[in-house]
């Protein structure tokens, strides 16, 4: 026998060609947004000696990532409808104000967003139907 065989990762990292060293909280949770940064902000803004659990930071990060993806998808659709390839603040405005739930959630004014196209029904010309006698 040539000696002892040890298991585990050891100093060189994971076996079988896997990722080396440690993994970030975001990678473990399968998220793109930074869990560590969100946790740091939560801890910094917590009142007094309030403790912040790691699952709270992961959950908040997942919610922020979902809302961002939702807004970007709707803004991308608005840009595609206007046949442009770049999302502008106008597209964000159209996307947010066009969705009732996002409109109630995001009440902020978007710079360079413009206004929604709307004409009051009282201002439209009334077209009378001609009846055949």
Swiss-Prot record:
CDD domains: HFD_H2A
MF-aspect GO terms: chromatin DNA binding; identical protein binding; protein heterodimerization activity; RNA polymerase II cis-regulatory region sequence-specific DNA binding; structural constituent of chromatin
Compartments in which it is found: Nucleus; Chromosome
Pfam family, one: Histone
Single GO biological process annotation from the record: nuclear-transcribed mRNA catabolic process, non-stop decay
Record-listed N6-acetyllysine modification sites: 4, 9, 11, 15
Domain of life, per lineage: Eukaryota
One cellular component (GO) term of this entry: nucleus
Keyword flag Acetylation: yes
Record flagged with keyword Chaperone: no
Residues carrying N-acetylserine: 2
Region (Disordered): 1-31
UniProt KW keywords: Acetylation, Activator, Chromatin regulator, Chromosome, DNA-binding, Nucleosome core, Nucleus, Transcription, Transcription regulation
InterPro entries to which the protein is assigned, alphabetical: Histone-fold (IPR009072), Histone_H2A (IPR002119), Histone_H2A/H2B/H3 (IPR007125), Histone_H2A_C (IPR032454), Histone_H2A_CS (IPR032458)
PTM field: Acetylated by ESA1 and/or GCN5 to form H2A.ZK3Ac, H2A.ZK8Ac, H2A.ZK10Ac and H2A.ZK14Ac once deposited into chromatin. Acetylation is required for function at telomeres. H2A.ZK14Ac is acetylated at the promoters of active genes.
Similarity comment: Belongs to the histone H2A family.
Assembly notes: The nucleosome is a histone octamer containing two molecules each of H2A, H2B, H3 and H4 assembled in one H3-H4 heterotetramer and two H2A-H2B heterodimers. The octamer wraps approximately 147 bp of DNA. H2A or its variant H2A.Z forms a heterodimer with H2B. H2A.Z associates with the VPS72/SWC2 subunit of the SWR1 chromatin remodeling complex. Also interacts with RBP1/DNA-directed RNA polymerase II largest subunit.
Protein's job: Variant histone H2A which can replace H2A in some nucleosomes. Nucleosomes wrap and compact DNA into chromatin, limiting DNA accessibility to the cellular machineries which require DNA as a template. Histones thereby play a central role in transcription regulation, DNA repair, DNA replication and chromosomal stability. DNA accessibility is regulated via a complex set of post-translational modifications of histones, also called histone code, and nucleosome remodeling.
Name of protein: Histone H2A.Z
């Amino acid at each position: 026998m040539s000696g002892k065989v040890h298991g585990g990762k050891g100093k060189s990292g994971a076996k079988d060609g896997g990722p080396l060293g440690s993994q970030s909280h975001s990678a473990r949770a399968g998220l793109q947004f930074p869990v560590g940064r969100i946790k740091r902000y939560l801890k910094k803004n917590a009142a007094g000696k309030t403790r912040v659990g790691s699952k709270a930071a992961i959950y908040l990060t997942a919610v922020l990532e979902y809302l961002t993806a939702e807004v970007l998808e709707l803004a991308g659709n608005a840009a595609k409808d206007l046949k442009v390839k770049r999302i502008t603040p106008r597209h964000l405005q159209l996307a947010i104000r066009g969705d009732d739930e996002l409109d109630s959630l995001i009440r902020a004014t978007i710079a360079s967003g413009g206004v929604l196209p709307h004409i009051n029904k009282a201002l439209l010309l009334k077209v009378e139907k001609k009846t055949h006698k």
